[in-house]
Amino acid sequence: MKRILFFLLLGVCLGLKAADRDDSKYLAGAVPEVNGVVTFEKQFKVPGQTDDQIRNTLMTYVKESLVKNAIEGLRTRVISDGTTGEPICARIEEMMVFKNKPLYLDRTRFRSQTTISVENGKATITISQISYCTGEEAEGAKTETFKAEEWISDKASINKAGTKLYPRSAKYRRKTVDRVEQIFEEAMASFEPKAEKPVEKPKRRSVVVEE
């Protein structure tokens, strides 16, 4: 009886915790689409550097941060390194961890494509072709693959009122938005790690963001 009461109280506490979560950051518009395809994009300028210098710095970031820390295999590779002026392009597969506790690990394989083009001192980073491979942690379970369009898009993951995320895909949407933001921030920081935000002191900043 005591054990039943314990789990009932635990369920209530978890429910209250979920209800208190502020998901405003992840609601409508947080996961943009281009022609029906989930596509994240960030543009920024790097004054004082040539296109080749910008491209080389970003290629180093892709190799040393994204590829090096990803899962080794056919799903992680550099497709184009931009050495002849073409866009940098890399396929990345990495582990996206939701919870990691003793005797419990909740994670998925996060797959995406990062494309970077540089022109006239401006870099454009695009992350698209996103999918998730789940189920490999459960013994005897079959893995399933979901595309971002059917799992974390506004239509697939937000209720009709536009006020809440559906529980089944909420963690994927949150983690994806956070991971994409992290990649954008790291890429910009590779030019000047201690740069100040342009809104605060634009004259002392060498990387100018264009939203």
Residue ranges and their predicted role:
Residues 19-211:
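Ser/Thr-rich, low-complexity intrinsically disordered terminal regions
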Residues 3-13:
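Sec-dependent N-terminal signal peptides
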